[in-house]
Structure formats: structure tokens, C-alpha cells
Amino acid sequence: MWTLTCQQFIALILLGTLVPSESFLCKHCFRKNLEKVHESFRDILSPPIFGVNPQPLIEVQQPKVTPKPESSQVIHVHQPQVILKPIYYPKVDTISTKNQIGIHGPYSQYPSLLPSANLLGIPNQQLINAQDVLSDKDQKQTQVQNNNLHIRFGVSALREGRNNPSLETISRDKVDKISPALQLQLLRYADSQSQSQTQSQSASQSESNASSQFQAQEQSNRLLENPPVSESQSQSESQSQSESQKQSQSQSQRQQQIQTQLQILRQLQQKSNEQSAAQSASQIQSQRQSDSQSNLQLQEQSQSQSEQGKPIQSQIQILQGLQQKELDDKSASQSQSESKTRQEQQKQLNLQQLEELSSSLSQSRLGLGQQIQSQLQKNQLDKQFASQFQSQSKSQLEQQMQLQLQSLRQLQQKQLDEQSASQSQPQSQVAQQIQSHLQLLRLLQSRLKTQSALKSDLEQQILLQLKKLTEVQQKQLAEQPTLRPSSKSQSPGQLEQQILLQLQNLLQFQQNQLKSDTQTQSQLQESKSNSLSQSQSQSQEQLQLQRDQNLRQLEQIKLEMQNIRELLQKGKSELQTQSDSQRRIHELYQNILQLNKEKLSYQLKQLKLKELEDQKKSQAEISKGSNPSNLFIIGQLPSEGKPAPGNQGPSIEPKLVPQPGSLDKLPSGGGLIGKPASTGLYILSPDFNDLSDYRDQFRLQQELKKHQNILSLLQRRQNDIKKQQNAQLLLGQQQKEQQAQESINKQQSSSAGSSSQTKLQQDIQSTGAQGSQQGLQAGSTGLQTSSLQGTESSASQSAALQRLKEQEQLRIQTENDQKTSSSSSHSNSQNSQSSSSQSSQASQSEAQRQEAGNRNTLLLDQSSSKTQSESKSESSSQSSSHSSSQSTSNSSSNVQSKLQGESQALLNNLSG
């Protein structure tokens, strides 16, 4: 998980939630947003320290996000976030001289005490040490006040306030220049200082007068009661003089410090503006005069006090000690209040940080939900594209197959036309031969009048045979035009069956002819030799032409078959890619479901833990509720049912909050936090747990809607697949029925023509040895290819081999029979050879067709075995295609069933 790539990805996600979507690609806005992010991180790491009276916190105005109309018409408007920082306006009042002077005016520390104090037996050294300690405290307080004077009149250049947003540091270039506002503030400060000094002088004069009167009265009383003691008076006078000297020294030090500060300010004023030099000089002179007057007055007052205020020194010192204690208590209480306010501010900042973190987490969750939505939409689009691609590929394959079938049919028509043209020529030759035969018969009839009965029978038989031949030829001529339109719908196997039937009829006719013409063969030997020479010369030329044509056609058929195979391979590869894509989609969907399950379980665990923690906290708070000193109010209660102005949220509940001592005891909710009040023990704060629960429920509803949409799409896809499967099953049943009918017809034809094939093979082997060799090669290749298809093809191959062996044995027997019967069969040889030439030509054309059929549909034999193997191979290929389609459909159905089961389980979990 924590590799570099993962860390970068997580950082991008977190930054993307903080940056708005519009300005993500704009460089200007991106820089501004990054700077804002840096500032927020700095504030989190080093929070600012506010003063005693904190102003309202920073308010951030969210930018107005305009919707994107189109990518071509986007006009980017720069609307940065406006951050309203609080501006602290310092009070331009007189300097509070409570810490310097006290509540009832200035006070001075005298070294001597009353004789009544000495009567108690306190040594003078201890009193002097106590006075020194008090004077040290005063000096420290004055130093602190002198250092903090710039806070009172807003001179921000003298303080380094990094964490305070209200204090702005002035650059070094701008130090020499003083604004007119600062000049006015300096003048006001000088006036206020002079006024405060005059007030302090008047107060000190009044006190000195009162003390002098009181001392005079006491002295008069003492003189009346006791005679004066010269030594004690001289000692007290010396002590008072030393104390007055010390006081004058401290006052001179203070005056020197004030003068140094004023000199610095005057130097700044002189550097600021040359125009205001005269005015500032006059003001400085007036201030100097006022300072000198105040110093003189203070000296006079000190002298008068040293002369007059001796008897009240002890009381004043006691009052000073009490005042200092009170001041110390006040300062301690102020420091405590300041620490409390700082702690409250830190708590506020921490709560704000928690709120920001919760908002960022919610935004990140929303971003993740949007990413999951986009991924699901992409998956749906991919599925739609895949289905469209499947339909398009199927339609393209069907179109290509139809075009190739049309081209094959056209080639078959051309072959039939050429065969009819080639057959028309031997038919004319046959007619001429028949005429010659008739002439010979007439001559024989004239010679053999004695044997009229036998000759009449023979003539009748020959005439019947000739009539049958003519009828057969007429039938062939009549059947050829009828075959042309039907050839488009008939397969090459059916055409071969029809041709085999015709050849069987011819062979039967020839057998009858041979039986009846054994007697007439001796008479027709001469005509036979002549007709043989002519027919052989003509048949050789025709055979060569037909062989050339057949070779060309075979090459064309080979090319077309290669194209068909390539298309089939492409279709298989496309099906494989589609199945792979479906598997990937299924795996992605399963991963998404697992993630959703884990999220749901994690959220349930968190909710349970939160409930337990809330219960524990509520119990602890109820147990602590008896001590009201541990609790205080944060925020303000709404009056008369009105909600609090700053609170936001769907539900507001009162909660008990402990005293702010540690951040670990803070509640989970947040709200507006202000000063502690003593009117009650409850606060108003929105419960963020309820908000998170509401958001989780909303997200769960969205996820349920997504799953329902996916299920509806999958059900539609399943219905389409079922329709396709039903159509394929109907086509397969129709093809099986056609194949069954063809096999029945072929079996009948093979049983009827098994007797006639023996003599056909003699003529075929004598004239077409090359065709038989090619057929055997094609049969061997067909056996090799069909051996992979199953047990049915192996059985057909063994049967075909047995038939070939039987045919070879029959051929050897017929050759022996022909050698023995050649001497006695010369009479009717012309008719037999003419029919044999026709049969040989037909057999050659058949052999060439069968070779093409062997390469197209893997036929093994020249007889019905080839057609049967074709039908079986077609059925096996169809069954394999059906099985592949069924396997794909089964896999798709399995995927759909799994998806439905998982979706139902999710629904049950959510409902539970």
C-alpha cells in the first residue's frame, strides 16, 4: 500500500478534495489554491494566540461554482475564496496607571517608620530589606509597562507578532516613513501623558496636604503629651532624606526612560516628513517644558512630603503592602483568566480543525463514491460496446457467408452450363452413331431373312433400348433447366445424389443391354472398331479441356474455402476476446461488491463503537453532573424556541461538557464556543454522528440504486442471449431434420446402386487415374482432419476404408470376367462403348466434383460414403458451434446467477 505511487495517488486525492473542480487546470487558480492549502497547514501546525478579548473567527466564503456548458465554450472566471480576517482596533485611551500609582493616587516609599513601629521591636535592617524588595517589584512592573507601551497606541513596528493576524510587520524600507495617522496618535499620546501627569500631581498634592495636616495634628498631640526627643527626630529626618533621595532617583530613572522613548519617537517623526518638522519641534518643546515642569513639581512635592509627611509613613507602607497583595492577586487572576481564554481558544481551534477534517473526509468519501460511479458507468458503456460489437461482428460474418455462398452457387451454375454444353456435343455424335447402327441393322435384316423370328425379337429389343436411351437423354435435357433454379437452394451433396441416380439408371440399362446383346456383338465388331477410333480421339480432346476447366475451378474453390476458414478463425478469436472481456467485467464487479461489503461491515462496527462510547460518556457525565464546578456553558441557549444563530445541522441536542483541562475529554460534536457562563450546565452543539449516519444512509441508497440498475441491464442481456439461443436451436433442429432426410435418401440410393458401381469403377480407373489419386489424397486428409472430431468420424473412416477395399476386389474380378468374355462379346460393343464413354466423362466430372467436395466438406469416397461423411462432419461442426454457443450462454448465465445472488445478499444485509 505505502509505495511511492500509492502515496502520490492518495496525496492527489486529498489535494483534489481541497481544490475546486473549476480551477484545477488553471495555473493561476492552482497556485492560489496551493498557497491557501499551505496557509491552512501552517495554521494547524502553529495556531495563533489571541488576546484577552477574542474577536469572531475567520469566515470563509465558498466560491460560486458555475456549471460547465461545453468543452468548446468554457469561459473560466477567476473567483478566488475571500478570507475575511478580523481587524483588532486598539483602544486609544489614556495609559492605565493603576499598576504604577495605585487606586487612590501616587504613593511613595519612605525609609523611616513611625516610632510606634519601632516600639514593637522590629529592627531597622529588616524593614529596609522589605522596602528594597517592594522597590524591586515596582521597577519590574515599570519595565514591563514600558516594554508594552506600544500595544496601547497601536505602534505595530516595535513588536514581533508572527502568530497574531491583526499585527502586520512593517518592512525596513517603510520604517523611516511615518503616516499622518501615526503622527496624530503620537500627539494624542503625548497629550494624554501630560494630562495623566497633571492628574497624578494634583492627586499627590492633595494626599501630601492631607498627610501634612494629619502629621501636624499628631505632632501637636505628641508634644503636648511627651517632650520632643531630638535624637529620634534627627534619625527619622535622616531616614526620610535617604528615602526621598531614593525615590527621586527612581523617578529620575523613569523620567529618563520616558525621555529616551520620546526621543526615539521624535527621531522617527523628524525622518518621516520634512514639512511637519517645525510643528513637531514646537510640540516637542512644549512637551519638554511640560515634562520639566512636572519634574519640578514632583521634586517640590517630594521635598514638601519629606518635611511634612513623617507620621503617616507606617500606615502608608501597610496600605502599600495590602495594595501590592491585591495587585498580585489581580494579576494572578488576570493571568489565570488569560490562560483560560487561551485554552478556550485552543479548544475552539482544535474543534475547527476537527470540523475541517470531518468535512475533508466527507468530501473524500463523496469523491470516492463519484469515482466508483464513474467506474460503473464505464463498465456499463464497455458492456454496451461489447454487445454492439458482437451484433455487428455476427451480422458481418453472416453477410460474408452469404456472399461466399452466392459465389459458390454461381460457380456451380457455370459448371452445369459447361457440362450441358459439353454433353450436347456427344449427344449429336450419339445420334449419328444410332443412325449408323440402324443402317447396319437394316442390312442385317435383309441378309438374315431366314432367321426372321429371332431377328424381329432382337430388333424389338434394340428399338426398346434405343427408345429408353432417347427417353433418358430427353429426361436429362428436361432436368438440366429445372436443376438450374433449384441449384441455388440445393447443396452440392444433393446434386451429386441426383447425378448418381441418373448414372445408376444408365448402368442398369447397360446391364440389360449387355445381356440382350451378347448375340449381336459378333456382327457389330467392324462398326465398333471404327467408332472406337473416332470416339477415343474426340474423348481425349474433351477430357483435356474439361481437366483444365476443372483445375481452374478447383483453385477458385480452394481460395474461397481458405477465406471461409479465415473468417471462422476470426469469429472464434472474437468470441474468445468477448469471453475474456466478460470475465474481466465479472471480476471487476466482484471486486467492487467485496469492497462495498467491507465498507458496510466497517461502518457498522464504527457505529456500534460510537454508540458504546456515547453511552459511556453519557454515564460518566451524569455521574459528574452533581458537581457544577466541573461544568460550564459553551454557546448560548436559544430563547423562546429560536435556534442559536451560528449552529448548523439537522439536529441539536444538549450535552454536558467537562471543564477545559485536556483535549481528550472533548465531545464528538462541535459548535460555537464562547465565554463560560454561570446560568446553566448545558451547551448547544450539532451532533456530527447523526450527520455521518444520515450521509451513510444516503450513500447506501445510492449504491442500492446502482446495483438495481446493473441487475436490470444484466436481465435484459440474459433475455437477448436466450432469444439468440432459441433461434440457434431452431436452426439446428431444421438442419438435423434435413440431414436425416438426406442420409435416408443416400442410404436408399447406395443400396440400389451398390451393384452398378463395380462396372463404373473400371471405366473411371481406366480414364481418370489422376482423379482417383487426388480423391484418395483428399480422403486421407479428410480422415486426418475428421479424426479430431470424435468417434463418429472414426467409424465413418473405417467404413470408408472397407468399402474401398471391397471395390478394389470387385474391380479385379470384373477385369478377369472381361478377359474371359471379350472373345464372345463383339456384336453390341458400339452401344456399350458409347454409353461407357458418356459414363466415363460423367464419372470424370463427378470425380472432379467429388475432389472439390472433399476439400470443401471432407468427403472420403466417390459414392454415398462421401456424402455421409459430409453430413456427419457438418453435424459435428454444427454441434461444436452449438456446444460453444451453449458454453458461452452457460458461462453468461452462471455469471448472471452469481451477480443476482450477490445483489440479493447485499439487499438482505441492508434490509437486516
Swiss-Prot record:
Residues 1-23 form the signal peptide. Residues 193-255, 271-349, 518-544, 638-671, 732-912 are annotated as: Disordered. Changing Q830E: In strain: WSII26. InterPro entries: CTLH_C. GO terms for molecular function: hormone activity. The keyword Secreted applies. It is found in: Secreted. Changing S335P: In strain: SENGWA30. Residues 803-818 have a biased composition (Basic and acidic residues). One of its GO terms (cellular component) is extracellular space. Changing E307G: In strain: WSII6. Keywords: Behavior, Secreted, Signal. Responsible for physiological and behavioral changes in mated female flies. Associates with sperm and localizes to specific regions of the female reproductive tract, including the sperm storage organs. It accelerates sperm accumulation into storage but does not mediate the entry of the first sperm into storage. Once sperm storage has initiated it seems to act as a guidance factor helping subsequent sperm move into storage, a corral concentrating sperm around the SSO entrances and/or a trigger for responses within the female that accelerate storage of sperm. This is Accessory gland protein Acp36DE. It comes from Drosophila melanogaster (Fruit fly).
